[in-house]
Amino acid sequence: MDDDFRLEELALHHKRELFRCASRSIEEYLRTLARKQDRNDSTRVHVYANGHGRIAGYFTLSAATLELRDLPEEIQRGRPKFPLPATLLGRFGVDREFENRGLGSLLLGLALVNAYAASKLVASAAIVLTIANDASERASALYRKYGFLPLPSNTNRMILMMSVVRENLDREDRLE
């Protein structure tokens, strides 16, 4: 990956129209809705782009809540019977030109680090995502590799507890 690429908030100079990925819905979202939803504070769109505005990948983060009854039993245990505050990893995509270079793992790691940092300011007990119907099995495998668990109520939705993210980040800090 070119060193000129970095994580940025979506801006006007980013060339959304050039983005092509395996999921049509993820591609269309970036072109047609991302700027509007970012501007009206519905989500935050983070792009991995170079200085020329070329987007190699992107993800969105926003606030969410999950009903306790929708969570796996091991997560429900010991929790108050209130909705669980969470961070929604709403959209996630890698441009076809940048596939098979480890960018998906890099972007997911950046999304988790950003979600964890935000959870220190505004409580969030978990990260939740929905796998797009037209997403590849590779996407699902990537999420499972990072520890995401399918929700019993909807197997297209997956959850990762923030405590797991914290443990993984602490482990990485100890290794450095």
Model-identified regions with their sequence ranges:
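Non-catalytic substrate-recognition and accessory regions of acyl/acetyltransferase enzymes
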Residues: 1-101, 105-140, 144-176
